[in-house]
Amino acid sequence: MDDWKPSPLIKPFGARKKRSWYLTWKYKLTNQRALRRFCQTGAVLFLLVTVIVNIKLILDTRRAISEANEDPEPEQDYDEALGRLEPPRRRGSGPRRVLDVEVYSSRSKVYVAVDGTTVLEDEAREQGRGIHVIVLNQATGHVMAKRVFDTYSPHEDEAMVLFLNMVAPGRVLICTVKDEGSFHLKDTAKALLRSLGSQAGPALGWRDTWAFVGRKGGPVFGEKHSKSPALSSWGDPVLLKTDVPLSSAEEAECHWADTELNRRRRRFCSKVEGYGSVCSCKDPTPIEFSPDPLPDNKVLNVPVAVIAGNRPNYLYRMLRSLLSAQGVSPQMITVFIDGYYEEPMDVVALFGLRGIQHTPISIKNARVSQHYKASLTATFNLFPEAKFAVVLEEDLDIAVDFFSFLSQSIHLLEEDDSLYCISAWNDQGYEHTAEDPALLYRVETMPGLGWVLRRSLYKEELEPKWPTPEKLWDWDMWMRMPEQRRGRECIIPDVSRSYHFGIVGLNMNGYFHEAYFKKHKFNTVPGVQLRNVDSLKKEAYEVEVHRLLSEAEVLDHSKNPCEDSFLPDTEGHTYVAFIRMEKDDDFTTWTQLAKCLHIWDLDVRGNHRGLWRLFRKKNHFLMVGVPASPYSVKKPPSVTPIFLEPPPKEEGAPGAPEQT
């Protein structure tokens, strides 16, 4: 053994080392896979058991149903038991047919719930001020009308009186105040609330809260009122809970003859309220009109686009006047509604007209602008052969000779490329400044409010660059910009053929309407023959203006133009005055003159090359801006142009009233 030596080919013996990390990981992974397979197998077995149990339950259920069908006795027992149960309070029969009504009034929130269903909830900031009114069907309890009247603002109480008077007797009325509803609640409105049985409504004070439920012409079901303790605070919130008994269906329905017109009327009157005699059971007002045809009607096949939103009572009034106008073609009318509102479409269906709804795009001014674009595009797509389109809005009254006015003047748009549009509206045509329904003007502004648009202008110029949805622009102000108008003018009448009656809208309220729209003159004379229509073409109009200026009597420029004595007490004369206007955009004196004449003064409208035309004391009155107007050459050398300096601005002057 002493001479033994280890073989150099054999690896020396050493102690066993620890397993490597790789082998450890591989071992654990193998165990995890085994565990996963075990879990999967268990899940499959569980699913199989579940399926077997479900199949057994289905078979047992079918067998039970089969046995029940063979023995009718259990069904009879069930029916007897069901008959002993109390029916649902809203739809059941018998003396328990009542509605549970909750009405809440407070400074910042109102809500109304009927049988646990909220039918009104308004807690938006700076919106919904005034008296909210809901009308329920007395037989079914469903909501027939929802309105809000901002009786803090002028004339909204008149709108509320009109609405409540047009609600049929027997309907359930619910009233509630948000924020403030008394400031312009006049005696007529208070007397009406008193006639409805309200005790607190006629005594409603500054910032009081009030809730009321009653039947028109019937009993009051509940009323709550909280007075404001001080001018700077509001009344406490009030919550009125009351039961309203339902009437029979017989009491809520009218029995008209079964005609196509009355079927339309019945569908309408069963759903909505506030439309007066159209739903009268005894003597309903007509919903079909037969105005005299218009001889040689040049606009018979011109499409009419009515731009509408969610103001159905406005739309109803507008469509009645439109369908009563001589020369109207109902099949050419399309009402475009911005949003999927039911009631405006109900109004459209009542009159048997075409209505199109679309999804609103954008917000505020941009939403209105996109609505106009979509409506104009759709109009020309619906009538691909039409060269023109008449554009109206839902808050306009239409004169009886509206289509006659357009028929006599529309050829000017075809023959004179210097024209932008024909409008039925005169921005400066007030009761004291408009006189001659046969007289037309050319003006540099686009008045809108009932106008004719040329297809080529829209498709080639306006549509491709119409303001996009992110631009919060007014569509009409955009159309008046020099880039769009490009020196072209519009034809307007001295006496407007449309009347803007709407006092609720994006850019409208009672104060604004009172100041700038209420006293506009509106033609009511049928069959007016327009005078010297072809003299409105570009070159001919210049000849006419120079003739008028040459014949006009120059007024005494030493007198105050704002005084009534500035014009003599005559009738049928033509007078001219010259005012300072240093350059084309210098309207300092004109703006002050417009203010004292109580006409449109918010921007410059109704002018033609520095010339304004209107009537005062039934005399034709012309005003020329010197030296900017080319008609300045008519100024006698001895006459000094009138200059009216604007008053200094008062610091901290209050603006228009907002939410209280």
UniProtKB/Swiss-Prot annotation:
The molecular function terms in GO held by this entry are: acetylglucosaminyltransferase activity; beta-1,3-galactosyl-O-glycosyl-glycoprotein beta-1,3-N-acetylglucosaminyltransferase activity; carbohydrate binding; manganese ion binding
In the UniProt annotation, what is the result of changing residue 474 to A?
Nearly abolishes enzyme activity
The pathway this protein participates in, as annotated, is: Protein modification; protein glycosylation
The main location class comes to: Golgi
* Outcome reported for the amino acid change (mutating residue 481 to A): Decreased enzyme activity
- Entry cofactor note text? The manganese ion interacts primarily with the substrate UDP-N-acetylglucosamine.
Role this protein plays: Participates in O-mannosyl glycosylation by catalyzing the addition of N-acetylglucosamine to O-linked mannose on glycoproteins. Catalyzes the synthesis of the GlcNAc(beta1-2)Man(alpha1-)O-Ser/Thr moiety on alpha-dystroglycan and other O-mannosylated proteins, providing the necessary basis for the addition of further carbohydrate moieties. Is specific for alpha linked terminal mannose and does not have MGAT3, MGAT4, MGAT5, MGAT7 or MGAT8 activity.
Disorder: Muscular dystrophy-dystroglycanopathy congenital with brain and eye anomalies A3: An autosomal recessive disorder characterized by congenital muscular dystrophy, ocular abnormalities, cobblestone lissencephaly, and cerebellar and pontine hypoplasia. Patients present severe congenital myopia, congenital glaucoma, pallor of the optic disks, retinal hypoplasia, intellectual disability, hydrocephalus, abnormal electroencephalograms, generalized muscle weakness and myoclonic jerks. Included diseases are the more severe Walker-Warburg syndrome and the slightly less severe muscle-eye-brain disease. Muscular dystrophy-dystroglycanopathy congenital with impaired intellectual development B3: An autosomal recessive disorder characterized by congenital muscular dystrophy associated with intellectual disability and mild structural brain abnormalities. Clinical features include intellectual disability, white matter changes, cerebellar cysts, pontine hypoplasia, myopia, optic atrophy, decreased alpha-dystroglycan on muscle biopsy and increased serum creatine kinase.
Q: What is this protein called?
A: Protein O-linked-mannose beta-1,2-N-acetylglucosaminyltransferase 1
